């Protein structure tokens, strides 16, 4: 198995941008994004989407049959039981697809960048060889959420409160990338980490990610 770097961070911390930076450094850096997998397994025609529609009703779909993710996020944010139901449905499917993808990519990857927004919240840190956190000041993060999602400040603040704190997340980090300014300011740090991960890949103990 390839060396697995778990990339995490709070909402609007810049995970996708940083992941893209890493993948651009080498074709042998494979990115596995938990959010992308979640979207793939809930496409029209999927078993997961049929179950979601049955549970929440047909109004959870757009007219073209695709999942209204924005509506779903709001529903589960204000309804803990619905959130728990959805997690029990999706998390095993996401883990299965993640492991399948890792098995496919391992032999042709120098290392795998595993992007997991809720790594700490879901206690998944134990499945990674290295944890890389993207840190951002709360006020900057708040402004990014409001701007991206077009929501009120109070709602954005509640979203932040629903995630683990910066400090709690930092306690698990092996390395931290600060994303408080321009993305270009992180380039050298990313290059240095990439070099370190290439070295680590040569000495890592191979394992199955969800076998612990």
Swiss-Prot record:
ATP binds at residues 12-17. Keywords: ATP-binding, Coenzyme A biosynthesis, Cytoplasm, Kinase, Nucleotide-binding, Transferase. Its EC number is 2.7.1.24. GO terms for cellular component: cytoplasm. The keyword Cytoplasm applies. Disulfide bonds: none annotated. One of its GO terms (biological process) is coenzyme A biosynthetic process. It catalyses: 3'-dephospho-CoA + ATP = ADP + CoA + H(+). Transmembrane segments: none annotated. The keyword Iron-sulfur does not apply. Gene3D superfamilies: P-loop containing nucleotide triphosphate hydrolases. Residues 4-204 form the DPCK domain. GO terms for molecular function: ATP binding; dephospho-CoA kinase activity. It comes from the Bacteria. It is found in: Cytoplasm. Pathway: Cofactor biosynthesis; coenzyme A biosynthesis; CoA from (R)-pantothenate: step 5/5. Belongs to the CoaE family. Catalyzes the phosphorylation of the 3'-hydroxyl group of dephosphocoenzyme A to form coenzyme A. This is Dephospho-CoA kinase. It comes from Blochmanniella pennsylvanica (strain BPEN).
């Amino acid at each position: 198995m390839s060396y697995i770097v778990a990339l995490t961070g709070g909402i609007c911390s810049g995970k996708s941008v940083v992941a893209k930076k890493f993948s651009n450094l080498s074709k042998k850096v494979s990115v596995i994004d938990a959010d992308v997998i979640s979207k793939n397994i809930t496409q029209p025609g999927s078993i997961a989407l049929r179950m979601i529609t049955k549970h929440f009703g047909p109004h959870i779909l757009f007219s073209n049959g695709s999942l209204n993710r924005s509506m779903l996020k709001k529903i589960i944010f204000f309804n803990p039981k619905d959130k728990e139901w959805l997690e029990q449905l999706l998390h095993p499917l996401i883990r299965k697809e993640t492991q399948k993808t890792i098995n496919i990519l391992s032999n042709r990857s120098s290392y795998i960048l595993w992007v997991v927004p809720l790594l700490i919240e879901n206690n998944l840190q134990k499945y990674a060889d290295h944890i890389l956190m993207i840190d951002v000041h709360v006020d900057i993060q708040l402004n990014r959420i409001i701007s991206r999602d077009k929501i009120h400040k109070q709602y954005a603040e509640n979203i932040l409160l629903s995630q683990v704190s910066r400090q709690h997340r930092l306690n698990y980090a092996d390395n931290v990338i600060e994303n408080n300014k321009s993305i270009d300011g992180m380039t050298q740090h990313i290059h240095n980490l990439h070099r370190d991960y290439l070295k680590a890949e040569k000495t890592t103990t191979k394992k199955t990610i969800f076998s612990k």
